[in-house]
């Protein structure tokens, strides 16, 4: 779980330390493993990343002939397993594997963003793959995300005489109706279609059971397409909500992360091998890597629709297929393959 990755980081470090030819560096619970590449590679510098943490939930796992079940099986222990399996191979291209903590929580705790001077190492790559679950498709870019808080004001009164006040909870209804009518765009960018969403995610209002409340708060999460900046997305949302607000109401931006640019350049062979390409619905660290100037995609085993659910699973066949696709794309020296 996020913030409790020490044991799995120790396990991954021990496994990587057994791989001949790999350099392993640890920064807190982030692991960076580097491979120099073979002499007959393409000359590319490839970066593969995966997060160690999971969302909260029930621990334990099960296995049958076809699947592995349990918290994080899909998001994203399957991807981590593929990364470790790649470390068994004699890769043709220079490759860096980064295993990092706290992706599922606040941006400032994310291990990929806490590398300090080592962040330059990430930027010194030609292409990057984030092994998030994509069900074997190559997913380009990612949505941006922002969370805003709306504070609505009314006038307090006794519930036996509600006409003497203005119920702030009643005002939530008109705002929510406006939210429901928001134009959730589906722009086509880089030959893939991004589907926007705007969701109410939290409400608060209470004084006492015999008081008409004079305050109510509503939180909204807007997942926006990569053709908008954070500022543009916020302006678009505020402009839509504003007609239902009074001068006393406020809108506060509490959290935001930029979208990731969809860029298939450098991934043509991987896309052909995967057989499917689409937009990434959701935010991933493709946004962060793209911001460093590294063309990046999402590609990994597991159905993203099962992520964060109470019935996560990953097919063993999906692990094999993802490993085969990445091995083919990077290139393997079969004659020098490690045991």
Region locations from a protein language model:
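A non-catalytic alpha/beta surface segment that caps or lines the substrate-entry region
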Residues: 1-42
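Metal-dependent amide/peptide-bond hydrolase catalytic core
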Residues: 4-7, 23-25, 133-134, 140-141, ...
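Buried hydrophobic packing segments
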Residues: 12, 80-87, 115, 172-175, ...
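Fold-independent oxyanion-binding glycine-rich loops
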Residues: 27-29, 50-52, 101-102, 127, ...
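Generic recognition of long tandem-repeat/solenoid scaffolds
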Residues: 31-35, 66-73, 243, 248
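Active-site metal-coordination/substrate-binding segment of hydrolases
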Residues: 42-99, 107, 111
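Acidic-glycine-rich active-site phosphate/pyrophosphate-binding loop
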Residues: 49-64, 125, 140-151, 297
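Acidic/histidine-rich catalytic neighborhood of metal-dependent amide-processing enzymes
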Residues: 81-147, 190
